[in-house]
């Protein structure tokens, strides 16, 4: 008995091994385009195991490659007879008709197949996927569309949206999106995500806007289309239109200006300062009793500051008006947690735009003592205070401020900025070895700007030291930069004018031209500054400041000239 069992097992193993070998060989023939050899093996294998979907599909594909229409049809019909519920096989039969250019026959067959299989949700899904498997996207869409007619739009909206998207059928997708959110508002987030992808960067979004407006008019009681219209305006970056829309929604829903405030903040992020200002002023206009009154005042101040200082030529009158606005805010609310951000802006204005460094120092020293402020905000105040001290010539206190931030935020961008400022201060003082040692650390800083600045300053030191034993030329140049930082134009210009005569063979020529351009720009002599920047990138195109000079020249040309 054992012998018979062993023989049977051995025979079974041999048969399986032979079949496995034949499968591999058939697949290899098929991949190599040797279809006739593959066909013989697949025919044999399929007879042995007609339930194998893998063998069936490979055999069918081989017959199609050999243009064996009758055999292909017989094979599929056999599969349908053995597995009548398997819709993949039924789609395959129509696919065979198409493959052999029997289009009318295929169309009649597919129309009948779809008509008979759209009553159940799972049936629709399987049939549509069967069409997609054979790259028959239009038929998959037809299946979903017929399913929608039978079972409602919500049953297949996700699949149909995806099919329209994959076939670039933007108009039908948009119309479907309207129907879906009208039928079920809970689909809004999903549908808007799809629309954002389809209408990326506002491309061809006029149709979307038109349809949204139409549905909003047809369904005035359904606020969801007003919400969608707001999304459309934002996607198109039409912030003025978005503000009008959000004002309407805010009023309708008694949001107390909250949504307008949020949109104004978004406008600031996108540098749409005029629209942001209008939004903040609207919320302020609601009155002091509204909860968003103070935040909107702070937002307005921040927007006005960013708008005013964005230009390389800030308007002095606008600076003065903004200073007055901030002072009024602080007078009404005091120096506290709520007004600290606006006071920080006031300090920046006084230090950098109003030639009143002392006032800026007093403000910052007051902010730092204010309770409940976040440590990161206090650190930002200390960095600005360090700059202000430095402008006053108070080097020791500047180092102290930078050092405190560096120590507290060692691995953070704030700490790296503080370390860079301290390295720059050492550079101003002529301590190039120490400055370069700190800059080398910062070359791998997480913040790209700090890393780039560190690399640039380190290269400046490296390229212009070691040429003489005293490094006097570089020290004088660094001192000139320091004087410019302090707005001491006379001292800076005096050094720059003498440097080429004192050190005629030095490599600082491009740096001198560049710093002279910065002096002229700071004085408002933009034409002269532009000439000097142009000289830098034309004469010294290979040097480290050429890109900076080109950038400054472009900014002056765009904003002033």
What are these regions (language model features)?
Residues 1-4:
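Positively charged n-region of N-terminal signal peptides that target proteins for export
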């Amino acid at each position: 008995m054992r012998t018979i069992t062993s023989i049977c097992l051995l025979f079974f193993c041999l048969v399986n091994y032979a079949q496995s070998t034949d499968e591999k060989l058939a697949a290899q023939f098929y991949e190599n385009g040797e279809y006739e050899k593959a066909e013989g093996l697949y025919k044999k294998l399929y007879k042995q195991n007609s339930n194998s979907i893998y063998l069936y599909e490979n055999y069918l594909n081989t017959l199609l490659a050999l243009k064996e229409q009758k055999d292909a049809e017989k094979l599929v019909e056999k599969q349908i007879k053995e597995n009548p519920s398997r819709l993949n096989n039924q789609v395959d039969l129509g696919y065979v008709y198409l493959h052999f250019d029997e289009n009318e026959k295929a169309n009649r067959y597919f129309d009948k197949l779809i008509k008979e299989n759209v009553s159940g949700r799972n049936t629709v899904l399987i049939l549509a996927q069967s069409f997609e498997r054979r790259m028959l996207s239009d038929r998959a869409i037809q299946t979903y569309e017929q399913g929608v007619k039978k079972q409602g739009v919500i049953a297949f909206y996700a699949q149909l949206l995806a099919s329209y998207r994959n076939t670039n059928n933007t108009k039908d997708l948009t119309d479907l999106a309207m129907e879906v959110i009208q039928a079920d508002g809970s689909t809004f987030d999903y549908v808007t995500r799809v629309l954002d992808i389809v209408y990326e960067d506002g491309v061809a979004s006029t149709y979307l806007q038109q349809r949204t407006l139409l549905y909003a008019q047809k369904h005035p009681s359904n606020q969801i289309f007003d919400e969608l219209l707001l999304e459309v305006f934002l996607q198109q970056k039409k912030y003025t239109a978005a503000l009008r829309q959000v004002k309407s929604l805010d009023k309708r829903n008694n949001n107390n200006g909250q949504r307008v405030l949020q949109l104004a903040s978004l406008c600031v992020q996108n540098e749409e300062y005029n629209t942001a200002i209008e939004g903040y002023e609207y919320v302020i206009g609601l009155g002091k009793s509204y909860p968003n009154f103070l935040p909107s005042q702070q937002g307005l101040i921040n927007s006005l500051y960013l708008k005013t200082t964005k230009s390389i030529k800030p308007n002095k009158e606008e600076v003065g008006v903004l200073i007055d606005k901030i002072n009024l805010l602080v007078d009404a609310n005091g120096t506290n947690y709520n007004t600290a951000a606006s006071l920080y802006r006031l300090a920046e204005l006084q230090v950098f735009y109003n030639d009143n460094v002392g006032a800026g120092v007093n403000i910052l020293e007051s902010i730092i003592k204010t309770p409940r402020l976040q440590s990161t905000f206090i650190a930002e105040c200390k960095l600005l205070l360090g700059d202000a001290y430095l402008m006053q010539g108070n080097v020791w206190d500047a180092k102290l401020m930078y050092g405190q931030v560096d120590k507290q935020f060692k691995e953070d961008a704030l700490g790296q900025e503080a370390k860079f400022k301290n390295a720059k201060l050492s550079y101003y003082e002529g301590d190039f070895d120490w400055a370069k040692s700190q800059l080398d650390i910062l070359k791998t800083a997480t913040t790209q700007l700090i890393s780039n600045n560190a690399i640039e300053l380190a290269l400046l030191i490296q390229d212009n030291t070691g040429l003489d034993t005293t490094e006097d030329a570089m020290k004088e140049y660094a001192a000139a930069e320091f004087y410019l930082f302090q707005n001491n134009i006379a001292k800076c210009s005096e050094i720059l004018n003498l440097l080429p005569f004192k050190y005629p063979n030095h490599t600082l020529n491009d740096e001198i031209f560049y710093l002279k351009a910065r002096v002229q720009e700071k004085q408002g002599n933009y034409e002269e500054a532009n000439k000097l920047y142009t000289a830098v990138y034309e004469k010294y195109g290979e040097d480290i400041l050429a890109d900076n000079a080109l950038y400054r020249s472009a900014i002056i040309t765009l904003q002033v000239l």
